[in-house]
Amino acid sequence: MFMFEKPHGMRDTLPGLYETKKKVRRSLTDLIDKWGYQFMETPTLEFYDTVGVQSAIEEQQLFKLLDQDGKTLVLRPDMTGPIARVAASKLLKHGHPLRVGYAANVFRAQEREGGRPAEFEQVGVELIGDGTTSADAEVIALVVGALKNAGLASFKIAIGHAGIADALFVEVLGNVERADVLRRFLYEKNYVGYREHVKSLPLSSIDKSRLLELLELRGGIEVCGRAEEIVDSAQGKSVVDELKALWDILEDYGCTENVRLDLNMVSHMSYYTGILFEVYAENVGFVIGSGGRYNKLLGHFDSPAPATGFGLRIDRLIEALHMKDEPCEIDAVIFSKEQRAQAIAYANEERMKGNKVVLQDLSGIENIDQMTKSFANVTYFIGARKEEQNG
């Protein structure tokens, strides 16, 4: 019946899954908090002309609506734009790098046949006002630490750079615009299409080989040496030097086992201007998080500042962890009128110990056997006696 249907892409979170999400969220936010990031919240609704326009999310994925004054609003499609707005208007006045954390739901319209959620929770950080490679390394190292703290044992962070493909394309094709088709193939990870398109271009065999070699630039620090062989410009060499410096810092953090370079990475997040990355878990075929440097975004809010950050998807992380819904850890105290005072006192004592306790009047239960199956332990205060039943 229609009354039980939900809008396309919207999902209910039942108690068991809610507890699982809470546990995973806390494991991430606890570590982020220890790294000195301060958490904040922003409105669910933002103006389209500010946050909506500057969002990296594609236009057709924005949820739009009108307010009473006829202004177009959007449900926030990500948290980077809203935090950039707040930083530009209120926080950057402090004059030092900002470290901001968040745990929030974001909204992206989905195709009906896609089966993807249109609302999902992200936990992440933004480091604003620090343009150094140390800042890039910090957020990547924080991702590694947060995922380990959540219990994820096997994962890789693929690190790329927005400038490496652009530098090569400019050298070979003359400008970035002529490379739009190649960039689309890389974004879609359609490497067969990329190869076929390169072969069709009116280029020398040497230049075609350079474009094709881009697909092979994956691995450890040795990838930087191979990248230097296919880029000649100062811009390209500078990107390689930046990646080398990043790797050195990640070695100091002790997290290079969880990272690899992927220099043909292209993100749909068009505002990325430098180092960018995606997080993959073993046996999971989708990205569970991503991030990177976006030095131009704050300028759109009249407060130019370098920035980097990341966002992790709670739902995908739960799937990567192969977590089942959290088992019930709630106890019940069932009482009759004769022992109501004793039952209330007992329940309060247990709650003071940190236990979760439901206090239930016997007269309000239709099927006591069915109800007690929902609790870990049940204590009865009925008539003149007290009885305990362990789940």
From Swiss-Prot:
Biological processes, Gene Ontology terms: histidyl-tRNA aminoacylation; L-histidine biosynthetic process
One MF annotation (Gene Ontology) recorded for this entry: histidine-tRNA ligase activity
Functional pathway: Amino-acid biosynthesis; L-histidine biosynthesis; L-histidine from 5-phospho-alpha-D-ribose 1-diphosphate: step 1/9
GO cellular component, one term: cytoplasm
UniProt keyword terms in alphabetical order: Amino-acid biosynthesis, Cytoplasm, Histidine biosynthesis
SUPFAM superfamilies, alphabetized: Class II aaRS and biotin synthetases (SSF55681)
Cell compartment(s), UniProt: Cytoplasm
Function: Required for the first step of histidine biosynthesis. May allow the feedback regulation of ATP phosphoribosyltransferase activity by histidine.
Anything else known: This function is generally fulfilled by the C-terminal part of HisG, which is missing in some bacteria such as this one.
Subunit structure, as described in the record: Heteromultimer composed of HisG and HisZ subunits.
Family that this chain belongs to: Belongs to the class-II aminoacyl-tRNA synthetase family. HisZ subfamily.
Protein name: ATP phosphoribosyltransferase regulatory subunit
